[in-house]
Amino acid sequence: MLLAIDVRNTHTVVGLLSGAKQHAKVVQQWRIRTESEVTADELALTIDGLIGEDSERLTGATGLSTVPSVLHEVRIMLEQYWPSVPHVLIEPGVRTGIPLLVDNPKEVGADRIVNCLAAYQQFAKAAIVVDFGSSICVDVVSAKGEFLGGAIAPGVQVSSDAAAARSAALRRVELARPRSVVGKNTVECMQAGAVFGFAGLVDGLVARIREDVKGFSADDDVAVVATGHTAPLLLPELHSVEHFDEHLTLNGLRLVFERNREAQRGRLKPAR
């Protein structure tokens, strides 16, 4: 059983995966709030409580964090509470297997890397990956499995909250599909802007990528896949997205773990 931890700015996904390579699958998944000042002990208590008896069945652990301080605590947690379980964290020096053809590879978020890795492994062709998180990342991987870059926009919830916070006449609203793109009250108007507006933003970015990037035209075989917590809300309004994979990031983490575990076995004791 592989423990996978995906720490983002606002929420953390904890998953358990069984099997390996093409037989691997996510068997359980939890979503908890990210606390930037969380300690290793607090993380251990939370995760051990979630996975229960599977804690004794772990054969490996892997994780990433877009919050550097939390990644440090994840490392300490794994070393102290599961010392015999091999672990691989996505950080500089870890082999991901995907070339980063960008100006500064160190700037590329670990979540973007593993998403593109998982998409390329799953579809075996050029892909555009749309991750709906606190930010919306639209990333591009070539037919050779190279990370070409992408575009980053504010996330749906972040934008909606910012509009409410900076306007006396607006308030925070539930993210839900309104009756129509033409809202009949303030809540519906904000929902229409969030749902239909961001669907249009993503469709527009995908269209521009297909126009501007060689090998991504309408005549080329390109997979467009979405992932992320708010993706299901927008999927019915998206015209450019063909696939949805809820577990794309967790599977990307698994791929990196499998690539690096031989080196880990040489340094760490076997799992209990």
UniProtKB/Swiss-Prot annotation:
Record's catalysed reaction(s): (R)-pantothenate + ATP = (R)-4'-phosphopantothenate + ADP + H(+)
GO CC terms:
cytoplasm
Q: Where in the cell is it found?
A: Cytoplasm
Q: Which InterPro entries match?
A: ATPase_NBD (IPR043129), Type_III_PanK (IPR004619)
> Where the protein is mainly located, per its record?
cytoplasm
Q: Provide a GO biological process annotation.
A: coenzyme A biosynthetic process
Its EC top class is: transferase
Entry EC no(s): 2.7.1.33
Superkingdom to which the source organism belongs: Bacteria
Q: Does the keyword Lipid metabolism apply?
A: no
Cofactors required: NH4(+); K(+)
Q: Which Gene3D superfamilies match?
A: 3.30.420.40
Spell out the family assignment given in the record's similarity comment.
Belongs to the type III pantothenate kinase family.
Q: How does it assemble?
A: Homodimer.
Q: What does this protein do?
A: Catalyzes the phosphorylation of pantothenate (Pan), the first step in CoA biosynthesis.
What NCBIfam families does UniProt report for this protein, alphabetically? baf (TIGR00671), PRK13318.1-3 (NF009845)
Name the HAMAP family on file: Pantothen_kinase_3
Which protein, by its recorded name, is this? Type III pantothenate kinase
In the UniProt record, the gene name given for this protein reads: coaX
